[in-house]
């Protein structure tokens, strides 16, 4: 009986560690975020979806690729599409269930309403694990557009903010 009680206490003490285990080198993750808006008559609608795949280099460093797709539908006009593909690197702080991160991304933007061009910028976000493999993520990205390396410095101040909220899964 004493041995059973000791094992039960040990198991109860280790359970939170197992549930809140941080990703390790080689762990992969996928995320999915979305947003949308319409006017009151649904004559103009905007839908955005963003997904990513990444792999941890260690428990703090994550690199990967992000894909954004935007669909713009306005009554009387053809539906317009926009996309952005970029590689990213994020550094995560801490080891608990809530981990802030900072990072940067570089890639391209393309579509019907934009000039095909390069984009880059810093990002900051937060991940909160609800169990060992599933998390909620929020992020703010500052993206600026440029056609060449020499133009990047000139256009940095003319960037835009991109917000996302989504779910992620580690495997």
Per-region residue spans from a language model:
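Helix-adjacent hinge/juxtasegments
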Residues: 76-107
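Cleavable N-terminal export/targeting peptides
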Residues: 1-27
């Amino acid at each position: 009986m004493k041995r059973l009680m000791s094992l039960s206490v040990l198991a109860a003490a280790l359970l939170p560690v197992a549930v809140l285990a941080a990703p390790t080198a080689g762990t992969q993750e996928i995320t999915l975020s979305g947003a949308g808006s319409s006017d009151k008559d649904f004559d103009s609608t905007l839908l955005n979806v963003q997904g990513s795949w990444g792999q941890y280099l260690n428990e703090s460093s994550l690199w990967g690729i992000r894909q954004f797709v935007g669909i713009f539908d306005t009554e009387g006009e053809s539906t317009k599409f926009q996309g952005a593909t970029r590689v990213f690197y994020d550094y995560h702080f801490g080891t608990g269930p809530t981990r802030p991160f900072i990072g940067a991304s570089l890639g391209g933007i393309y579509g019907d309403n934009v000039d095909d061009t390069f984009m880059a910028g810093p990002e900051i976000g937060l991940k909160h694990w609800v169990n060992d493999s599933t998390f909620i993520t929020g992020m703010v990205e500052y993206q600026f557009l440029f056609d060449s390396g020499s133009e990047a410095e000139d256009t940095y101040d003319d960037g835009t903010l991109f917000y996302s909220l989504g779910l992620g899964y580690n495997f």
